[in-house]
Amino acid sequence: MILKRISILNYKNLEQAELEFSPKMNCFIGQNGMGKTNLLDAVYYLSFCKSATNPIDSQNIRHEGEFFVIQGFYETDQGEPEEVYCGLKRRQKKQFKRNKKEYNRLSDHIGFIPLVMVSPADAELIAGGSDGRRRFMDVVISQYDKEYLDALIRYNKALTQRNALLKSEQEFDEELMLVWEEMMASAGEVVFKKRSEFIAEFIPTFQSFYSYISQDKEKVNLAYESHAMSGGLLDIIKESRRRDRVMGYSLKGVHKDDLIMQLGDFPIKREGSQGQNKTYLIALKLAQFDFLKKTGGNTTPLLLLDDIFDKLDAFRVEQIVKLVAGDRFGQIFITDTNRDHLDKILKKIEREYKVFAVEDGEVTERKEMAE
């Protein structure tokens, strides 16, 4: 998928922008706070029907405006034109259209324009709790496996109901408890199986990307942890019932799964430098891109790289740019504050690219840089 052109009105600090993009590399240069991330967020919005940074839609309207509009004009991998429109007025329902036909459900649009975004917020995958790492698995697997998504929805419904029973001050209903536990176990076994299969296939690709970027300076790994590894999930959940009633929530199940992120034999959270952590996260997201491309039929995802070069040495920056400029990846959108070093790298790799300057919400193409 290629985003050929975008039109933006009143989105965050972007009052108006009409931009035509390179089918390969697009770089947005400017100081922090100028609107580079907002521009990438508008591209993200057209894929996921929401902002990557602010889930409250009305707050994404420019302060002086009463509405925002984002329109994207795409070309599929098969050369077919596609138009996506999003509009929101204050205190009104959001409109989302594909080729001028409005969606009945926004969820019908998800997956049509696959996209992977790498941003500073990804640091929470290492530094944060296990919920973010489970969400990472869920986002990838749910985009290509409907059975997984259905099982996850069933599991979460049963978990919510079981937790409500555990908290209830009324007489304990053992029969109803068993109903929810059996649903948790049957759905949870599907979730566990598919997460296990995903991680087993994902790890070699992830390690390959990390090895390339670091030039084999360090070894990395991912280890999947789940209560389901120690036996039948129903027995595990039932055995925890007494303790769960004391705590008021479910302590065992796939909702407690985790990914252990390792540098060598140790947790990267404890041992990794800022540069190693950043490299680890970028390799994770590039592997996610590769996985979605393989499982998504004939659609190449868009790749957004927001301020990813901070904390990386010049060598690793060059390795990453060379990698994503290759044929394995499609259209790329990059933000950076350092115009000079990025321009030198891009000229070295001899691929088509455009450079845009972003200042106080105004975006202008710098043709003289893209020689």
Swiss-Prot record:
GO terms for cellular component: cytoplasm. It comes from the Bacteria. ATP binds at G30, Q31, N32, G33, M34, G35, K36, T37. It holds the Pfam family SMC_N. GO terms for molecular function: ATP binding; single-stranded DNA binding. Keywords: ATP-binding, Cytoplasm, DNA damage, DNA repair, DNA replication, DNA-binding, Nucleotide-binding, SOS response. It is found in: Cytoplasm. HAMAP family: RecF. Belongs to the RecF family. This is DNA replication and repair protein RecF.
